[in-house]
């Protein structure tokens, strides 16, 4: 738990003053905060093999430290052999301490383990939120490579209270996300 406390303390002691100075906020309440991290795995192949959902739930729960839930389809699509309410993905939403703990492990341990890693893209969604696509779940040290039956990717979305992309980018950069270039393109 000391890592979590240190990341929160770093936010209060270093990141808030840096962003206040950079953007000229009059109050510390204007400084953007990281609200939640949503990890999602879309598993279209789960229509053919039902065990993939259970495997993905256990792996995502191991990675995040929180129970993952299956997401279900909203409607029938006959071309994909998909029925309404059939499980087709897995997701977990992290907030508070678990969010900071996961962010710390992602930045310090998991991202550097990606082969030929040169940084992540710096494109945000227009509202200060950022989604990172990961190709393989094996970059996380919690996953035992010997027990992997299928390589599964995931989307990691960082939801911030930032009003603009520049504010969101600055916040995530201060948290240590390794963007490809020093300034936003």
UniProtKB/Swiss-Prot annotation:
Cysteine disulfide links: none
Alphabetized UniProt keyword annotations: Ribonucleoprotein, Ribosomal protein, RNA-binding, rRNA-binding, tRNA-binding
Gene Ontology cellular-component annotations: ribonucleoprotein complex; ribosome
Coiled-coil spans in chain: none
GO MF entries: rRNA binding; structural constituent of ribosome; tRNA binding
BP GO annotations: translation
UniProt KW tRNA-binding keyword: yes
Function: This is one of the proteins that bind and probably mediate the attachment of the 5S RNA into the large ribosomal subunit, where it forms part of the central protuberance. In the 70S ribosome it contacts protein S13 of the 30S subunit (bridge B1b), connecting the 2 subunits; this bridge is implicated in subunit movement. Contacts the P site tRNA; the 5S rRNA and some of its associated proteins might help stabilize positioning of ribosome-bound tRNAs.
Family, similarity comment: Belongs to the universal ribosomal protein uL5 family.
Binding partners and assembly: Part of the 50S ribosomal subunit; part of the 5S rRNA/L5/L18/L25 subcomplex. Contacts the 5S rRNA and the P site tRNA. Forms a bridge to the 30S subunit in the 70S ribosome.
Protein name: Large ribosomal subunit protein uL5
Gene transcribed to yield this protein: rplE
């Amino acid at each position: 738990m000391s890592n979590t406390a240190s990341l929160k303390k770093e936010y209060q002691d270093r990141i808030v003053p840096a962003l206040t100075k950079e953007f000229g906020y009059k109050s510390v309440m204007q400084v953007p905060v990281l609200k939640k991290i949503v990890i999602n795995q879309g598993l279209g192949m789960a229509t053919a093999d039902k065990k993939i959902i259970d495997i993905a739930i256990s792996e995502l729960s191991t990675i995040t430290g929180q129970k993952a839930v299956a997401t279900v389809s909203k409607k029938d699509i006959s071309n994909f052999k998909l029925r309404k309410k059939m499980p087709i993905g897995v997701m977990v939403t992290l907030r508070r301490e678990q969010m900071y703990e996961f962010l710390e492990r992602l930045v310090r341990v998991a991202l550097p383990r990606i082969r030929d890693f040169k940084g992540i893209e710096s494109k945000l969604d227009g509202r200060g939120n950022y989604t990172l696509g990961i190709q393989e779940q094996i970059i996380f040290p919690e996953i035992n490579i010997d027990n992997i039956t299928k390589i599964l990717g995931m989307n990691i979305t960082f939801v911030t209270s930032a009003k603009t992309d520049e504010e969101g980018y600055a916040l995530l950069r201060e948290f240590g996300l390794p963007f490809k270039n020093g300034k936003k393109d």
